[in-house]
UniProtKB/Swiss-Prot annotation:
Gene: rsmG
Lineage: Bacteria, Pseudomonadati, Pseudomonadota, Gammaproteobacteria, Thiotrichales
Protein name (record): Ribosomal RNA small subunit methyltransferase G
Database matches in NCBIfam families: rsmG_gidB
Spans through the membrane: none
Keywords for this protein: Cytoplasm, Methyltransferase, rRNA processing, S-adenosyl-L-methionine, Transferase
Family classification: Belongs to the methyltransferase superfamily. RNA methyltransferase RsmG family.
Reported function: Specifically methylates the N7 position of guanine in position 527 of 16S rRNA.
Amino acid sequence: MDIMKDKIRQALSELDILATEVQIDQWLDYLKLLEKWNKVYNMTAIKNIDEMLVKHLFDSLAVAKYIKGDSTVDVGTGGGLPGVVLAILYPQHQFTLVDSVGKKIMFLKNVKKSLSLNNINPLNTRIENLEGNFDNIISRAFSSVDTFYELCKHFLTEHNQMLAMKGRDLEERNLESLPLNIEKYSIKVPFLNAERNLIVMRKKL
């Protein structure tokens, strides 16, 4: 476990993120819960906690600096990625975690209770049925960018942003068709030898 903590500290340093030992313990406790539930409920395709550390925890932390304001909705959150990871980092920020799969929301309610994460609100619903105001609308491995936009455009205002976490495929053709201001960022994930990108979309003024 100390080796994993050291790896987290190194990743935080590379990402220029300040975190406490309590937060590091919370991230590890979260991953242990995810690994435990995964054996029964198939929460994620990644089974190994060491692999989860990089492909889930560090991948989620790599977009932390792009989160603005004080509220975020995580669309198709699955096992709570990136929402739970970011909620631990930003305890004053409210995260609404949305998924249509009941067992995943059941898991997230367990995470909320076990880790005393009062700034997450897991909701078992479809995103198109949700109403509310959020500073960030984020998705990771949820859908194509154009589908993400179509399902979430009712949240978009002049003051917030949509963030799509992507791999190598930036879906350039889909992006060109969207009536949005679009910025693309190459994301460096510590200990991961794979291309990761973030697409930030805002309403045209």
